[in-house]
Amino acid sequence: MILVWLFVAAAILFGLLGLSLYMLRPETEKTRSFAAFDHTMIAHRGLFDNHSEAPENSLAAFRKAVDQGFGIELDVQLTKDGKLVVFHDFDLKRMCGIHKKLTELTYAELEQYSLKGSTEKIPLFSAVLDLIAGRTPLVVEIKVGYDYKATTEAAAEML
């Protein structure tokens, strides 16, 4: 009887060991989905200089990043009229010099402001995706000022 219990205990131990090894194995599907990020430097908010014609989170900064082989990290949030735009801050003070929240303005209202005195405007996420055209890895940060669900759904729909 002891021999049977030893056999059962050994079988359970080997089963648990096998299960542990299976659970710790590299996930090839997940590994493949992140392969684009291997050895790719990421340009945070694009390849920008806020004292030039390529301020952060602008089409010019993203164009420079793509042209120089960088991946891109960017921030998206919704305007008052539900347009998904690329912009980091919740207010426009630092980048546009006005005391308003992005979520208080429509996209048409945002178009009248330039980024850091350049000719660049706050871009629509769709315009950035058109510019990038799948040529480089993209890290999208969802900025939520008021509606996480709508912002996330809008970004997911475009991706």
Give the location of each predicted region.
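Phosphate-group recognition and catalysis centered on beta-loop-alpha active-site segments
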Residues: 2-159
